[in-house]
């Protein structure tokens, strides 16, 4: 049995793409996933399965297409994936920065292209780490936040709708939920 985090993009944001978590948990349980749990309303779902990841991705894509067609991108990571990522995080990730976010790669995303685009940005008072699961992005000061490449350019990037973003607090909570 493998424990997974399913990070869904763009649900329950600003009253759009409404998903009732209790219903989603039941539907995913009916799909054959076990120990299905959610954390907050923004698309953090956890479950256990013996099904290989590749097959799970196919199953979830088909499920979302029928039941939640507005869910077109998601990230699926195992507890093992998460723990390996944490082992390789840079020292700055544990420091007290103004803001820290993880831009999770979604299934099927051209990661090399995303990295190339982000590497071309001129950073302002911010720091990056390219991980296996996503891009870890730290902003040093709240005062300079609006000058950062993160604030000025990220929304305009062609891949923006194909990543799902979580802050550092949620990233830590994902780790806790994966251990359950």
Go through the PLM ranges and name each one:
Residues 2-42, 46-180:
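Surface-exposed, charge/polar-rich loops and edge strands
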């Amino acid at each position: 049995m493998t424990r997974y985090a399913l990070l869904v993009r763009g649900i329950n944001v600003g009253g759009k793409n409404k998903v009732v978590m209790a219903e989603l948990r039941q539907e995913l349980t009916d799909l054959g996933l076990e120990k299905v749990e959610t954390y907050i309303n923004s698309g953090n779902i956890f479950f256990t399965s013996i099904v290989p990841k590749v097959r799970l991705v196919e199953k979830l894509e088909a499920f979302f297409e029928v039941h939640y067609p507005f869910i077109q991108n998601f990230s699926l990571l195992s507890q093992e994936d998460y723990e390996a990522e944490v082992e390789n995080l840079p020292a700055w990730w544990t420091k007290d920065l103004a803001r820290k976010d993880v831009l999770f790669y979604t299934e099927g995303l051209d990661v090399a292209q995303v990295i190339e685009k982000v590497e071309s940005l001129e950073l302002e008072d911010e720091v990056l780490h390219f991980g296996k699961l996503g891009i870890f992005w730290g902003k040093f000061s709240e005062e300079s936040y609006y000058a950062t490449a993160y604030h000025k350019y990220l929304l305009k990037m062609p891949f923006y709708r194909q990543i799902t973003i979580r802050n550092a607090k949620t990233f830590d909570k994902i780790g806790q939920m994966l251990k359950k």
